[in-house]
């Protein structure tokens, strides 16, 4: 597979996506072993945290010493690492890899984080003081009507009772002076991808057992 199609795959950077325990990381490592100019970037919302190795199938120390890995074990679980920071970390890794003349293989496990990188989502900033003021208003229905006045496109896509999303939309709209719906390409717009993409779909006894094994390990750690 790699010898036949490797040149096609690695004319640019490669993105491998798939379900939990589908073998994404193993495929990336095997590809990197066969092509010496490959470095791996994790696109997983949990792998960024230290100490999450079992729950996220983080590559072993030996694998990370053999093949350069990026955006893994970079913050503590108690630290906040918002999506824009994640985007910046991946973009920095991509630039450094390119400067070395190498190719990147991105391994994606979290849908939103993959999309933030691939589709270059524009993530609106947070405005905590504005949010605190909005939260002082108890009537969610009033907030929804206010959102509908300011950004009817956003309100049409948010359930009237979903206070968390309503507050966030108002926070961004009031804080930036732009409609919340103007951020990002939206769920129905897909710009050209800068990556060759491979999706792994595995539904088998072996896959189910791998998923169960991971689940058992996590449960055992929580109970100890």
Regions found by a protein language model. Give the residues of each.
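Phosphate/pyrophosphate-binding catalytic cores of soluble transferases and nucleic-acid-acting enzymes
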Residues: 2-209, 214
């Amino acid at each position: 597979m790699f010898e036949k199609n490797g040149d096609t795959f690695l004319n640019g950077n490669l993105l491998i996506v798939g379900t939990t325990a589908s073998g994404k990381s193993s495929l990336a490592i095997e590809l990197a072993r066969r092509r010496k100019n490959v470095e791996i970037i994790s696109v997983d919302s949990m792998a960024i945290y230290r100490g999450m190795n079992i729950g996220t199938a983080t590559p072993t120390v030996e694998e990370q010493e053999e093949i350069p890995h990026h955006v893994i074990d970079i913050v503590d679980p108690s630290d906040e690492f918002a999506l824009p920071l994640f985007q910046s970390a991946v973009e920095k890794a991509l630039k450094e890899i390119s400067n070395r003349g190498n190719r990147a293989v991105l391994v994606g496990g979290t849908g939103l984080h993959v999309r933030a990188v691939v589709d270059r989502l524009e993530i609106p900033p947070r405005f905590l003081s504005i949010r605190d003021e909005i939260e002082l208003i108890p009537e969610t229905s009033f907030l929804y009507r206010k959102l509908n006045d300011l950004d009817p496109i956003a309100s049409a896509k948010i359930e009237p009772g979903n206070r968390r999303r309503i507050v966030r939309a108002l926070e961004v709209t009031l804080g930036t002076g732009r409609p919340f719906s103007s951020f990002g390409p939206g769920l129905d717009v897909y710009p050209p991808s800068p990556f060759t993409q491979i999706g792994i779909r595995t539904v088998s006894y072996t896959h189910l057992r791998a998923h169960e094994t991971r689940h058992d390990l996590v449960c055992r750690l929580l109970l100890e």
